[in-house]
Amino acid sequence: MCRLLGVSRSAYYDYEQRRCNCPDDLHHRQLLNAVQNIAKSCDYTYGSRRMKRALNALDYRVSRWKARRLMQEAGIQVKHRKKYKVTTDSNHPLPVFENQLNRQFTVARPDQVYVCDITCIWTQEGWLYLAVVIDLFSRKVVGWSMSSRMKTTLVCDALRMAIWLRRPPPGLIVHSDRGSQYASKAYRNLLKAYGFIGSMSRLGNCWDNAVAESFFGSLKQERCQWRHYQTRHAAQQDILQYIAVFYNNQRLHSYLDYKSPNQYEAEAAKSIKAA
């Protein structure tokens, strides 16, 4: 047969091997379709580890190796991270809080420790500044605020949103870097009014606020660096969609055993109620 076809025996066997490795069956086509849908829903940001977990959640029992092969077969390329400028201004004469957190990033319950930070996103109109408040328990973004200026009201509004949504009790630790906005009198008074405990990273040590830094890395890697925002309003709408729809509700978080923050909190609430 090989002589009739005009091909070598090794070429024929190589073709047969490739054909066997790519089965044209219903289950395989369903798997590929699921991979493509997951990749699209996460804006092509999931690597093979998260893809495996997402497929497992849909009752497809695949390994990470299998997930990688399916992604390759589907032609899916994952977006990669860039570096970004630091926005913290720690060079100020304002008083700072002691570091109460000390890199203890694991907590037992919601609304026990919040971490806060500011970043900037470029638009054709200029910089847009984003302040967030994250609950350490579930890594959920519980408060945020955006503005064209990096002023004290930016961080106060983000914390007020978290207070309004979550009603955290007195004694909550609120950690941030040493930026002047977090050291301001208005912000300190806000903490005092609700009986919260202020905490700040050590000077020049970004790892003390690693959870907030990690969120900003995900936001920019998975969304902002692939966009060309014409206006601040367009950026605000896109960031809002990322936080409220994708990150809190859908994105699989490795720290949460590949659950979304909302799913993790819901399961924790059920466990507490059943206890």
What is each model feature region?
Residues 1-275:
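Charged DNA-binding/catalytic regions of mobile-element recombinases
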